[in-house]
Amino acid sequence: MASLSFVSSSHLTLRTPSIALRSTGSSPRTSVSFSVKAQSVALSQDDLKKLAAEKAVEAIKPGMVLGLGTGSTAAFAVDQIGKLLSSGELYDIVGIPTSKRTEEQARSLGIPLVGLDTHPRIDLAIDGADEVDPNLDLVKGRGGALLREKMVEAVADKFIVVADDTKLVTGLGGSGLAMPVEVVQFCWNFNLIRLQDLFKEFGCESKLRVDGDGKPYVTDNSNYIIDLYFKTPLKDGFAAAKEIGKFQGVVEHGLFLGMATSVIIAGKNGVEVMTK
């Protein structure tokens, strides 16, 4: 495989990647590692996120319908798409945003936007993740856009996830950070209690998400979010998703299972592309 070089203010150099197969449960995962060397300055987390996001954007071809993710890492990808459109290097694409925030960003960059009603099939979606396990299953939605993210990414032919290495976990829920569940406002506390009880064996604590003013956080869909915090990882993400879905008033959850086709992880030692 040919060497790839990136020249930027960080003076990054990508050297020839090595390829290895790793066993991850029932199916092997292909891992392609790109060595990254900082020649003059230390790489920040944002530098690495940007590098990984730009790597994901390389998969975009003219004529594609794109799913545009939400969050700090996805924003770098949207920025890069806008730059390529402006320079003429990319053309004849349309995007479907996963949040009002992403919609505003895309419009400001001149990215043509459409919706699922007119474009129900998506060629490629690019988004970030909050947790990534060895099987490329995900926790997403800490940015509050989980419902629209899942609607868009579930119908994508390819779904590339971009994240930094702090998002890697051995089991979903293992980071100790929030796993979001979007619920209707009506009797939200009823579902908060039920969700905490459902996962009591994992030491779950459920909290209503609030904004900077201490008021309930309201999603783009006018719903609330209940954040679940686990002391131990979930044993079976698919079983957990099924049980959450049984609760009336639950709109969506942040378990994105069997959806990612590849994950690009940026870390202090380089960028790794993992595929199923």
UniProtKB/Swiss-Prot annotation:
Pathway in which the depicted protein is active: Carbohydrate degradation; pentose phosphate pathway; D-ribose 5-phosphate from D-ribulose 5-phosphate (non-oxidative stage): step 1/1
Biological process terms in GO annotation: pentose-phosphate shunt, non-oxidative branch; reductive pentose-phosphate cycle
Superkingdom in the source lineage: Eukaryota
Post-translational modification: Phosphorylated by SRK2C.
Residues recorded with modification Phosphoserine: 108
Pfam families from the UniProt entry: Rib_5-P_isom_A (PF06026)
Keywords carried by this UniProt record: Acetylation, Chloroplast, Isomerase, Phosphoprotein, Plastid, Transit peptide
Reaction equations catalysed: aldehydo-D-ribose 5-phosphate = D-ribulose 5-phosphate
Transit peptide feature range: 1-39
Enzyme class: isomerase
Stored InterPro entries: NagB/RpiA_transferase-like, Ribose-5P_isomerase, Ribose5P_isomerase_typA_subgr, Ribose5P_isomerase_type_A
Positions where N-acetylserine occurs in the chain: 40
One GO cellular component term: chloroplast envelope
EC number(s) stated in the UniProt entry for this protein: 5.3.1.6
Sample GO molecular function, one term: ribose-5-phosphate isomerase activity
Disulfide bonds: none
Places the protein is found: Plastid, Chloroplast
Coiled coil: none
Chief subcellular location: plastid
Task performed by this protein: Catalyzes the reversible conversion of ribose-5-phosphate to ribulose 5-phosphate.
Family the UniProt entry places it in: Belongs to the ribose 5-phosphate isomerase family.
Protein name: Probable ribose-5-phosphate isomerase 3, chloroplastic
